[in-house]
Amino acid sequence: MPDVPETVGTPDGSTEFEHRPTTDQSFENALAKARNGTRLTVDDAVELFTTGTDRDGIDHDRKEQVLEAADRRRAEVVGDEVTFVANLNNNVTTACNTGCLFCNFKDRSEQFRSDYQEDHGGFTKTPSESRQIVQDALDRGIYEVCSVSGLHPALALDTEHREILETSDRGDLNYRSPDEYETDPATYCEQLDAMNVGDIHLHSMTPEEAYHARRGTDWSYEEVFSRLQDAGLDSVPGTAAEILVDEVRDVICPGKIRTDEWLEAMAAAASVGLDMTSTMMYGHVENEYHRALHLQRIRDLQDRTGAITEFVPLSFVHEETPLYERGMVDGGATVDEDELMIAVSRLFLDNVDHIQASWVKYGDTQGLKMLTCGADDFMGTILSEEITKRAGGDYGEFRSFQEYADMITAIGRTPVERSTDYEQRRVIDPDADVLGPQLGPRADGTPLLD
């Protein structure tokens, strides 16, 4: 893994990147191919993202043509259902020193050491705390727990891995003994085992975390994911992808694994029988050609594995990130770019049935609009530890089944509760007196929150 620089030069995607959004293709030809279902090329995707490289800026009429084509494709592939899952987010720790410039989630790992004197807003949970959080949410009716965390230096795959790290004399492993920290995060396997309660679906361990879980060893990703699977892992979130083009990763996340290693880890997860999701975090320093290359790499991975259940475009939220604070970006993607991202993803990824609209990223109004641009999934309830506390408080990002039913039916679509892998589905009656989950292991239709 490369060292994280203190500063990174500000690239102008139109002048300094090797990959530029220029093609020998025409917008009209790309749109025609999209409409008739011909597999698109990278150049086709660039033309659709830009609404024509022969134009300066996004052409509104052309954009609407792309959105219409994507919405028709969505209807052909998945119909008028809009799915969502009853889920919980339980992130183990915010401690991380990877230094990604787009991130405002992490806290410097040294702040968590037992000799650190100043207050900080981060957290690390013990396995027993994670288990209690999941147990409470399971009793409320959730189907899935999603857990994605910072790369805490004390985290190891299991006790064998910890012993290897403890005895290693290498100084490049990003490892410190848990004895040095106020709270011991235990191991990845211990955390997963703790969260593996009552047949809940456990969605965790990104490729970046899998790398962290094998550092200092010659273990394959297959070995790592097999051990995680034995601890209870059911599926893998395809986050940490950001943009799968190394010249972009060199700018926004130079401390993260490279594109090839991300793809290797995902293929390994699929090879041991784990389903996975896929993502793209866009709207920062990258250009349309990078976005198209990213989509091609996701599509190629799906051609090889068939294990990707959904694609999730994640619009960059720039506030309070180093990219923004250092003047490397002046904002995120525009609304037009967001809509075209959903649409082109639908048209390009002909082997991924489900495209998700993130209401957390887009907001409710624009999130619903994305469901007319090619998306068919509307995330999940995102119950969290803070929400499960009985005594008041801010419910934050939680979304109830009643809210889902009201919003989805308002745009003329059918609300459907789903499982993580989309194999289990339940059409929801928006006129029912009480709306709650029924697919979770302990769900009985009671609302998640009273």
From Swiss-Prot:
[4Fe-4S] cluster binds at C96, C100, C103. Residues 82-350 form the Radical SAM core domain. Binds 1 [4Fe-4S] cluster. The cluster is coordinated with 3 cysteines and an exchangeable S-adenosyl-L-methionine. Keywords: 4Fe-4S, Iron, Iron-sulfur, Metal-binding, S-adenosyl-L-methionine, Transferase. GO terms for molecular function: 4 iron, 4 sulfur cluster binding; 5-amino-6-(D-ribitylamino)uracil--L-tyrosine 4-hydroxyphenyl transferase activity; 7,8-didemethyl-8-hydroxy-5-deazariboflavin synthase activity; iron ion binding. Its EC number is 2.5.1.147. The keyword Nucleotide-binding does not apply. Residues 1-24, 430-450 are annotated as: Disordered. Pathway: Cofactor biosynthesis; coenzyme F0 biosynthesis. It holds the Pfam family CofH_C. InterPro entries: Aldolase_TIM (IPR013785), CofH/MnqC-like_C (IPR045567), CofH_family (IPR019940), F420 (IPR034405), FO_synthase_su2 (IPR020050), rSAM (IPR007197). Catalyzes the radical-mediated synthesis of 5-amino-5-(4-hydroxybenzyl)-6-(D-ribitylimino)-5,6-dihydrouracil from 5-amino-6-(D-ribitylamino)uracil and L-tyrosine. This is 5-amino-6-(D-ribitylamino)uracil--L-tyrosine 4-hydroxyphenyl transferase.
